[in-house]
Amino acid sequence: MRKGLIILGDLKDQDLIWLSRAGQVRDCSANEILIAEGRDVEDLFFVTEGSFAVRVGGREVAEVGVGDVLGEMSFVEKRPPSASVVAKGSARALAVPRAALLEEFRRNDAFAARFYRALAVFLSDRLRSMTEGDDGELDEGLLDTIHVAGDRMLRLIDLLEGAPAA
């Protein structure tokens, strides 16, 4: 199960509807760059189809796929990414503009709280797995919401069906 789903686990259906409307579908072909190392990222990406290679200095360090979230570090820090993300084949992601998210957070405190909590749990889990060794397992506390997160990812994909690609 993709750990990026952690973020969707804390969101509500109304949040998914907003994300699907605020974002734009990005269809990528093989070897297309979604995020370029060292270049500003203005979107937060939710992978909805296919897989992407995460590359540092041209060397693949990870593979991400459906359910993963990309650009989250640049979203939090507003710094250029330290890695590139490249489509491994035909792939699709929902690109939600950072500016739109921040504006919605100003209007909707409850959404902002849910989103930032989910992002904090996601980043905490990532840090814990790096410092304690990643055994591929999710924390027991996260298992309670992971089925909800999977359902939410499927709902997001359904909401995007037929959406025009960028």
Regions inferred by a protein language model and the residue ranges of each:
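A generic structural signal for residues located within well-ordered alpha-helices
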Residues: K3, L11-Q14, E42, G65, ...
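Cyclic nucleotide-binding regulatory domains
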Residues: I7, E32-S90, R98-L102
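A small-molecule sensor/coupling module
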Residues: D15-L16, P81, L101-G141
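Phosphate-/nucleic-acid-contacting segments
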Residues: E137-A166
